[in-house]
Amino acid sequence: MATEHAPTASEYVVHHLTHLNSTGHAQTSIVDFSVINVDSMFYSVLLGLLTVFLLWLAARKATAGVPGRFQGFVELLVEMVADQAKGIIHSAESRKFVAPLALTVFVWIFLMNAMDMLPVDLLPRIWEGVYASAGGDPHHAYMRVVPTADLSATLGMSCGVLLLCLYYNVKIKGVSGWVHELFTAPFGSHPLLYPINFAMQIIEFVAKTVSHGMRLFGNMYAGELIFILIALLGSTATVFGFVGHIVAGSIWAIFHILIITLQAFIFMMLTLVYIGQAHEGH
């Protein structure tokens, strides 16, 4: 009976790449704005609360004496983000908000990326058990645990950065100054160039926002998929499969630590760069 219901390799991969969403069944269309990925929302909020707690704990434990390991690490992280923010955003007033925001973004995205380090089947199996105990079909108990491997989540964050850029454009340059820039940059203030300038500005905003979210999503989705494929080696019930699963999984996990850290840093840096550009005129 166990082998009768055992999923094929393709079914295993598809199952692990399917979200728990608001409809209660697998999404069939590529784009459907009526669908909410509940798993991504849950883990994003949960890890966001964990981020706030960790930063609050670090601030609470801060002392003037010799710092402990945790405090020393947090101070090093804060100084790194503050230095990056100071080099990109020259307004001290803006940095009071943007620098803590960048630190929060880095820690939050790092924690979301780090969910990829958990065993592939750990949380999904637990969810299957809960779902089955509630009377549901465990074969339809979907659960993805890496929010940053969900394009809707990463684009949502990049859209948040876009809104901040628009806010600082208006705050720093004024409404009239920003509108003037929209129609006169980058090719000049000749009336015939107004439509071209405006189109170029819109393309720039859209391209930065889409690439900002896509870069994080693409790297984390690929990393998640590789972990799933490595997990398949362990199901082959052969010595080669078992050894390959252990060796490949260990090597990829070590390398993936660099990826999850680097992607969090890149997203944070691009956030600073885009907000910094809003402070500058063309």
Curated annotation (Swiss-Prot):
Domain of life of the source: Bacteria
GO CC terms in record: plasma membrane; proton-transporting ATP synthase complex
Keyword hit for Ligase: no
UniProt keywords, alphabetically: ATP synthesis, Cell inner membrane, Cell membrane, CF(0), Hydrogen ion transport, Ion transport, Membrane, Transmembrane, Transmembrane helix, Transport
Transmembrane segment boundaries: 38-58, 97-117, 145-165, 187-207, 225-247, 261-281
Family: Belongs to the ATPase A chain family.
Database matches in PANTHER family: ATP SYNTHASE SUBUNIT A, CHLOROPLASTIC
Subunit (UniProt): F-type ATPases have 2 components, CF(1) - the catalytic core - and CF(0) - the membrane proton channel. CF(1) has five subunits: alpha(3), beta(3), gamma(1), delta(1), epsilon(1). CF(0) has three main subunits: a(1), b(2) and c(9-12). The alpha and beta chains form an alternating ring which encloses part of the gamma chain. CF(1) is attached to CF(0) by a central stalk formed by the gamma and epsilon chains, while a peripheral stalk is formed by the delta and b chains.
UniProt protein name: ATP synthase subunit a
